[in-house]
């Protein structure tokens, strides 16, 4: 057996697993041949090791036997990869001493320019929705024997209040100003489903054992799927267990703004001490660091310091770390040292459960049929789902009418009309044809080759799920086919989604494109 057999095994596993499964469990494995002829697969942590051992080891051995020869029993060993921080730090320059940072003129500083600094305009443009609009800083920080503490005397020239800044706007549910956490984001009100099951389990483990094997925890997925909720739930749980824990949550833009402010005031040493003294650092939307070289340099050393100190980090992003353009490879590599998990758009059952929970929290009686109707129509993300529910509740409150499926349809009629306008059979055919790199005329033709028939079946299934057209109408729209052909296509795609990872991923991607 050789590493070539493992490479063949990787190719097969990538075709069998969904993208998120492969990226989470298989891609992080590092293979090497041991002197005794064993193939050793090293996992980045115990969590991945246990999962691969329990779920995938049998399949891996089957494939190795297939590629190495049926008569050769695969000699396979699974282990946890040892993290040698000394070696890791040799890969790149070590962090400079805290006292060696020179003063930098922000007008000539690349980071200041990247962050939007302009003379006379403050750190960043305070546009509506900007994470830096209406910022307040708490009392300036000084060093004490137990870390940073707030002082009440006025700021001195050149002194920077390096706590995470907070908004003047109060978030519903209350904010813990010490950690900048929204206390309404908890594990108790997070709805678990197939789409977020792994991320939820990993977050619970981190909350119970911060700084352990799953450090950093990297959560990625689209907008409005619950990444921030889950990350803040960990922070809230950590502070519930230890009220004195120094947990800091912030958006990545805030980290950049704090650093630029520190450079302006010649207080970069205080900045370093603060961010390296926390017990847990939670940073949202890490993709904002892309293209900001000075920020990445500083965060790289902060990352190393926290990891070596056993301090927990949780990062969120809108994409897999390897796919972040403009981010240094050394950071991408380190993001994978812990556990990387995906959150997918919620499936129908989870969407219904979310609506029922939100209605209950609002003291509103929502029937299953009404929740099902909303969940069937709003598929893109949790944020839009909640927005639709709030609209229905408000309409019910103002009119005094009970919430029924008909009332829901009436309340959301303009939203549904817009959705129907955007998602119609013509658009579905166009998007599917572009996705599979075929012509729309191929979908309407009598051709039955798999390269055309399968995309046609996918398009028919999407048309049934995303539009209100009947089976005869769908069949007719695809080259004058009858309703039995459309029904067969829908059933076939549903069956393939359970057995074919490629079809399952294609369908998810197309659904995301059509509903976002």
UniProtKB/Swiss-Prot annotation:
GO-annotated molecular function: ATP binding; ATP hydrolysis activity; DNA replication origin binding; lipid binding
Cross-referenced InterPro entries: AAA+_ATPase (IPR003593), Chromosome_initiator_DnaA (IPR001957), Chromosome_initiator_DnaA-like (IPR020591), DnaA_C (IPR013159), DnaA_dom (IPR013317), DnaA_N_dom (IPR024633), DnaA_N_sf (IPR038454), P-loop_NTPase (IPR027417)
Compartment(s) of residence: Cytoplasm
Region Domain II, annotated ranges: 72-179
The keyword Ribonucleoprotein appears for this protein: no
Binding site for ATP: 224, 226-228
Pfam families with a match to the protein in the record: Bac_DnaA, Bac_DnaA_C, DnaA_N
Predominant location: cytoplasm
Region (Domain I, interacts with DnaA modulators): 1-72
UniProt-annotated stretches for the region Domain III, AAA+ region: 180-396
Chain spans, region Domain IV, binds dsDNA: 397-516
Any GO BP: regulation of DNA replication
Assembly and interaction partners: Oligomerizes as a right-handed, spiral filament on DNA at oriC.
Protein family membership: Belongs to the DnaA family.
Domain-related comment: Domain I is involved in oligomerization and binding regulators, domain II is flexibile and of varying length in different bacteria, domain III forms the AAA+ region, while domain IV binds dsDNA.
Function: Plays an essential role in the initiation and regulation of chromosomal replication. ATP-DnaA binds to the origin of replication (oriC) to initiate formation of the DNA replication initiation complex once per cell cycle. Binds the DnaA box (a 9 base pair repeat at the origin) and separates the double-stranded (ds)DNA. Forms a right-handed helical filament on oriC DNA; dsDNA binds to the exterior of the filament while single-stranded (ss)DNA is stabiized in the filament's interior.
Protein name, entry field: Chromosomal replication initiator protein DnaA
């Amino acid at each position: 057996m050789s590493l070539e057999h493992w490479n063949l095994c990787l190719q097969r596993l990538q075709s069998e697993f969904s993208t998120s499964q492969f990226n989470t469990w298989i891609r992080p494995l590092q293979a090497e041949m041991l002197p005794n002829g064993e193939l050793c697969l090293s996992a980045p942590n115990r969590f991945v090791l246990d999962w691969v051992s329990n779920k995938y080891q049998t399949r891996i051995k089957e494939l190795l036997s297939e590629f190495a020869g049926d008569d050769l029993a695969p000699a396979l060993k699974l282990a946890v990869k040892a993290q040698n921080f000394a070696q890791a730090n040799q890969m790149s320059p070590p962090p400079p001493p805290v006292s060696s940072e020179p003063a930098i003129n922000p007008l000539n500083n690349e980071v200041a320019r990247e962050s939007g600094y302009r003379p006379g305009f403050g750190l960043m443009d305070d546009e509506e929705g900007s994470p830096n609009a209406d910022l307040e800083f708490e009392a300036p920080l000084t060093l004490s024997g137990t870390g940073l503490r707030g002082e009440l005397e006025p700021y001195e020239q050149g002194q920077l209040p390096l706590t995470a800044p907070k908004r003047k706007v109060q978030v519903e549910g209350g904010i813990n100003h010490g950690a900048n956490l929204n206390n309404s984001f908890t594990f108790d009100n997070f709805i678990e489903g197939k789409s977020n099951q792994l991320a939820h389990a990993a977050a619970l483990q981190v909350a119970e054992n911060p700084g352990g094997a799953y450090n950093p925890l990297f959560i990625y997925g689209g907008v409005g799927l619950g990444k921030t909720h889950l990350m803040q739930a960990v922070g809230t749980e950590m502070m519930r267990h230890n009220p004195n824990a120094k947990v800091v949550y912030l958006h990545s833009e805030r980290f950049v703004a704090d650093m630029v402010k520190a450079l302006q005031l010649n207080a970069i040493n205080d900045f370093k001490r603060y961010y390296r003294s926390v017990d847990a650092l939670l940073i949202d939307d890490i993709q904002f660091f892309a293209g900001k070289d000075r920020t990445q340099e500083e965060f790289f050393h902060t990352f190393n310091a926290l990891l070596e100190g056993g301090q927990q980090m949780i990062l969120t992003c809108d994409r897999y770390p390897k796919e972040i353009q403009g981010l240094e490879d050394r950071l991408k590599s380190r993001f994978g040292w812990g556990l990387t998990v995906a959150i997918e758009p919620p499936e129908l059952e989870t969407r219904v459960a979310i609506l029922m929970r939100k209605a209950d929290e609002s003291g509103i009686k929502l029937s299953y049929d009404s929740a099902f109707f909303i969940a069937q129509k709003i598929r893109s993300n949790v944020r839009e789902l909640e927005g639709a529910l709030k609209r229905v509740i408000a309409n019910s409150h103002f009119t005094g009418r009970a919430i029924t499926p008909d009332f829901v349809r009436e309340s959301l009629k303009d939203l549904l009309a817009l959705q129907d306008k955007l998602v119609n059979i013509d658009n579905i055919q166009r998007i599917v044809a572009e996705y599979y790199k075929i012509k729309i005329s191929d979908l309407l033709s009598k051709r039955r080759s798999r390269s055309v028939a399968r995309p046609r079946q996918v398009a028919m299934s999407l048309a049934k799920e995303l539009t209100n057209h009947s089976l005869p109408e769908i069949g007719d729209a695809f080259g004058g086919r009858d309703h039995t052909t459309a029904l067969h296509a829908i059933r076939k795609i549903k069956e393939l989604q359970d057995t074919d990872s490629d079809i399952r991923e294609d369908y998810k991607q197309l659904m995301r494109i059509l509903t976002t």
